[in-house]
């Protein structure tokens, strides 16, 4: 198949547009990712009040986390938030999807040092990067 220069330029423009659309995050999405990071850090430290405080910046998605009565409840709510976060972080530089093989749970973080939010201090190092963006 022979492509002329106009076709090649058009394909390049469409590809560039698709990449720029994927990379663009709204201010609301940026706020969500920042709050998710704060909740993550709090759960790593077994800090229920810190996780609940971060939930306020997660919008309606943070309601379950904000009402958590225990770390177990907070981690269950955080797992649901991680599904949305994986979608938001896809294609964003600096975000890494981690997986804990023991608990079979995923989360997103910006650090390349494993910080498992599901096992707290007891399992902080359990997990590995599944996908880097």
Residue ranges of model-derived segments:
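Bacterial N-terminal signal peptides that target proteins for export
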Residues: 2-11
């Amino acid at each position: 198949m022979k492509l002329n220069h106009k076709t090649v330029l058009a394909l390049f423009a469409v590809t560039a547009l698709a990449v720029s659309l994927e990379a663009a995050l709204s201010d609301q999405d940026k706020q969500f990712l920042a709050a998710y990071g704060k909740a993550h850090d709090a759960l790593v430290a077994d800090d229920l009040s810190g996780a609940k405080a971060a939930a306020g910046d997660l919008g309606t998605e943070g309601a379950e986390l904000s009402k958590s009565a225990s770390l177990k409840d907070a981690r269950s709510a955080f797992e649901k938030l991680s599904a949305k976060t994986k979608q938001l972080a896809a294609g964003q530089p600096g975000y890494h999807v981690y997986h804990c093989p023991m608990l079979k749970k995923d989360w997103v973080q910006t650090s390349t040092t494993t910080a498992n939010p599901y096992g707290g201090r007891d399992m902080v190092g359990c997990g590995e990067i599944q996908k880097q963006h």
